């Protein structure tokens, strides 16, 4: 299969005109924000397979997405340092220029009927992405003043190189994402399942989050956590269920069973181990 399409995103009213505070961080409006445009293309193949008692599908696709005037929230001094909170420091949505996201995606879906009493369902997926800024040294905006980050003055001219912890990749993106889910159906009534989720290390964040003073005085532990989890995140979930009858199912679900600490972005802890008892009814 193949596909090609174009996209257009107009800035939201909040990005254009609303200045606010979120969890102690100032968010500034940008009435000069330009729309984001782009195109995407995909080339893939989906193949049915059968091996002994297993049947399923394998899907492989390559993709590329190109963006122009991409919008991204960037840290800087956007407000008057004499009158605004935190000396005018905060985030604002700005156009960072031309970007590209390319990669491959593999997905597998299969079922094996081992015997009359056991059926196994498998679902797996893996995505590799290479999200980059085409011109990391290009000045895309100017802040009001300079910021001292780890002893280096940044600004007022902002580039992707001087505002990022790793400018070789877009901020807050993963390059490797994988998930595997296995479900065992026993005697049609008992269900056991497990899933594993993996993402690699988030290499690029706003450079300000790596500042030693910020890590010591305002948001302790960001650098320590990034170093601790530099190999990425591996999360395990399990579930068990029993079909009470044709219309009712009782399930026990445990997410993040090993209670791993992980973050989707700096200072944003994701849920710890959760245990849920679920009753599903068909009415």
Where are the predicted features?
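Outer-membrane beta-barrel signature, preferentially recognizing the C-terminal barrel domain
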Residues: 7-67, 78, 83-113, 170-176, ...
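Extracellular loop and loop/strand-boundary signature of outer-membrane beta-barrel proteins
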Residues: 26-31, 90-96, 163-168, 222-226, ...
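Flexible, solvent-exposed coil segments and beta strand-coil junctions
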Residues: 17-27, 77-90, 146-163, 214-221, ...
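C-terminal beta-signal and adjacent terminal beta-strands/loops
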Residues: 8-9, 66, 198-222, 230-283
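Outer-membrane beta-barrel translocator domains and adjoining extracellular loop/strand segments
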Residues: 14-19, 26, 70-77, 129, ...
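Transmembrane beta-strands of outer-membrane beta-barrel pores
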Residues: 4-10, 17-19, 47-49, 62-69, ...
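Transmembrane beta-barrel domains of outer membrane proteins
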Residues: 1, 5, 44-48, 100, ...
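Gram-negative outer-membrane beta-barrel transporters
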Residues: 53, 57-66, 88-208
């Amino acid at each position: 299969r193949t596909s090609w399409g174009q996209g257009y995103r107009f800035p939201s009213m909040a990005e254009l005109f609303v200045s606010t505070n979120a969890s102690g961080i100032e968010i500034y409006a940008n009435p000069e924000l330009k729309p984001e445009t782009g195109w995407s293309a995909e080339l893939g193949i989906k193949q049915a397979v059968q091996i002994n008692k297993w049947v399923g599908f394998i899907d492989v696709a390559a993709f590329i997405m190109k963006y122009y005037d991409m919008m991204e929230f960037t840290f800087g001094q956007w407000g008057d340092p004499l009158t605004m909170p935190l000396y005018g420091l905060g985030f604002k949505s700005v156009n960072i220029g031309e970007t590209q996201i390319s990669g491959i995606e593999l997905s597998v879906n299969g079922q094996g009927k081992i015997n009359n009493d056991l059926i196994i369902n498998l679902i797996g997926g893996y995505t590799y992405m290479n999200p980059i800024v085409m011109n990391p040294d290009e000045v895309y905006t100017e802040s009001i003043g300079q910021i001292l980050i780890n002893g280096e003055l940044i600004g007022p001219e902002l580039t992707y190189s001087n505002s990022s912890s790793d400018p070789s990749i877009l901020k807050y993106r993963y390059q490797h994402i994988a998930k595997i889910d296995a479900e065992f159906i026993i005697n049609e009534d008992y269900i056991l399942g497990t899933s594993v989720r993996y993402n690699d290390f988030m290499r690029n964040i706003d450079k300000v989050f790596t500042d030693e003073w910020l890590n010591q005085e305002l948001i302790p532990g960001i650098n320590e956590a990034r170093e601790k989890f530099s190999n990425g995140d591996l999360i395990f979930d399990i579930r068990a269920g029993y079909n009470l009858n044709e219309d009712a199912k009782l399930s026990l679900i445990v997410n993040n069973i090993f209670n791993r600490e992980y973050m989707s972005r700096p200072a944003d802890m994701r849920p710890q181990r959760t245990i849920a008892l679920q009753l599903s009814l068909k009415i």
